[in-house]
Amino acid sequence: MKSVLLLTTLLVPAHLVAAWSNNYAVDCPQHCDSSECKSSPRCKRTVLDDCGCCRVCAAGRGETCYRTVSGMDGMKCGPGLRCQPSNGEDPFGEEFGICKDCPYGTFGMDCRETCNCQSGICDRGTGKCLKFPFFQYSVTKSSNRFVSLTEHDMASGDGNIVREEVVKENAAGSPVMRKWLNPR
């Protein structure tokens, strides 16, 4: 009798683990039927429920989310966001979190996808590669423009090279250049 009880105790958790998916879906139908879904929600963003059948409202950045609740509006984070646990519980004892942006280099639902862009920066929702033209050098400009010609050349901050001779000439004629303020 003890062996039957022990076997039952060991098999029940194994059965429950097999029933739960990575998405924590509960009571999912064998086949999705869109007629079983609630009417289409009117919200800013929607995501598929944990079963992958029906669209539900998604929580936005900074809003409360639940990782283990399925089929309820506003409980899952939208694309490009993930549910960051906040070590708190609601009145029912369910753990909740706050929707936060995906870390750089990841995108999609729950930030599961990896960005394959050359720059490593992609849209957190879609994964589309982002380009920042103000960080890219123009191809038509001379490549030696950004190289210092001598070891005493300086930069003025506007992309122009300031030679040591020019600084010495300005310092000799300008009384302002002779007086330096002590740093605080």
Curated annotation (Swiss-Prot):
Compartment(s) where it occurs, according to its Swiss-Prot or TrEMBL record: Secreted
PANTHER family in alphabetical order: ENDOTHELIAL CELL-SPECIFIC MOLECULE 1, ENDOTHELIAL CELL-SPECIFIC MOLECULE 1 ESM-1
Protein name: Endothelial cell-specific molecule 1
Entry-linked SUPFAM superfamilies: Growth factor receptor domain
Glycosylation sites noted in the Swiss-Prot or TrEMBL record: S156
Any one of the GO BP annotations: angiogenesis
Modifications made to the protein after synthesis: May contain intrachain disulfide bonds.
Keyword Glycoprotein: yes
Disulfide cysteine pairs (residue numbers): C28-C51, C32-C53, C37-C54, C43-C57, C65-C83, C77-C99
Record-linked Gene3D superfamilies: 4.10.40.20
Single GO molecular function: hepatocyte growth factor receptor binding
Keywords attached to this entry: Angiogenesis, Disulfide bond, Glycoprotein, Proteoglycan, Secreted, Signal
Tissue and organ expression note: Expressed in lung, on the vascular capillary network within alveolar walls, and also at lower level in kidney.
Stretches assigned to the IGFBP N-terminal domain: 24-102
A Pfam cross-reference name: IGFBP
Oligomer and partners: Monomer.
Induction comment from the UniProt entry of this chain: By TNF and IL1B/interleukin-1 beta, but not IL4/interleukin-4.
Segment forming the signal sequence: 1-19
Stated role: Involved in angiogenesis; promotes angiogenic sprouting. May have potent implications in lung endothelial cell-leukocyte interactions.
PROSITE patterns (UniProt xref): IGFBP_N_2
GO cellular component, one term: extracellular matrix
